[in-house]
Amino acid sequence: MSKVLFVKANDRPAEQAVSSKMYETFVSTYKEANPNTEITELDLFALDLPYYGNIAISGGYKRSQGMELTAEEEKAVATVDQYLNQFLEADKVVFAFPLWNFTVPAPLITYISYLSQAGKTFKYTANGPEGLAGGKKVVVLGARGSDYSSEQMAPMEMAVNYVTTVLGFWGITNPETVVIEGHNQYPDRSQQIVEEGLEKVKKVAAKF
């Protein structure tokens, strides 16, 4: 039985946030097509994950050197391990998030920091870093109110580009990506843009 991990990084309701609607649409379509799959859903805002900083980094380093950890470090390292191992054990992963101020919401950056661990999702070699998580099937669902398809706007898109770059660093070089964009910039076509995008989401979910 496949293990599927759904990761949502938006705390706004679906009627107000397109990426939340994409997430709900994907999950419901997938569950309908795969009723016996083992599914885990992570709502990153609800989890309120501690920032990845000195305590977790020092704890991880000290553990790798066989040094004694403080209670705080033990807790931080255990939290990182929990989500890292969950990700590594998943056969399929879906990320859903908006573009806010040119990038992803902060909880997703924290979560990705937990996962990006040398020796786990990538390793260092003489020829440069090498990804270790390439066997996963991954879908990236992104929404952005403006149209970033132009030559002028494309470099400012640091949400989907950020996530797919990190995935590639981990060896996941072929994630399937569905983006809904421009629904705020083009209000006269907003409903059509969203509806067409959600149809794409359904198709991807049905065959995932």
From Swiss-Prot:
The chemistry this enzyme catalyses reads:
2 a quinone + NADH + H(+) = 2 a 1,4-benzosemiquinone + NAD(+); N,N-dimethyl-1,4-phenylenediamine + anthranilate + 2 NAD(+) = 2-(4-dimethylaminophenyl)diazenylbenzoate + 2 NADH + 2 H(+)
Q: Which UniProt keywords apply?
A: Flavoprotein, FMN, NAD, Oxidoreductase
Name the source's superkingdom: Bacteria
Named from the GO MF annotations, one term is: FMN binding
Keyword Glycoprotein assigned: no
Give the cofactor note: Binds 1 FMN per subunit.
Recorded E.C. number(s)?
A: 1.6.5.-, 1.7.1.17
InterPro entries tied to this protein: Flavodoxin_fold, Flavoprotein-like_sf, FMN-dep_NADH:Q_OxRdtase_AzoR1, NADH:quinone_OxRdtase_FMN_depd
Checking Pfam families in the record gives: Flavodoxin_2
The free-text function statement in the UniProt record for this protein reads: Quinone reductase that provides resistance to thiol-specific stress caused by electrophilic quinones. Also exhibits azoreductase activity. Catalyzes the reductive cleavage of the azo bond in aromatic azo compounds to the corresponding amines.
* Entry-linked NCBIfam families: PRK13555.1 (NF010074), PRK13556.1 (NF010075)
- Record-linked HAMAP family: Azoreductase_type1 (MF_01216)
State the oligomer form and interacting partners: Homodimer.
The entry's protein name is FMN-dependent NADH:quinone oxidoreductase 2
Organism in which the protein naturally occurs: Bacillus cereus (strain ATCC 10987 / NRS 248)
Q: Which gene encodes it?
A: azoR2
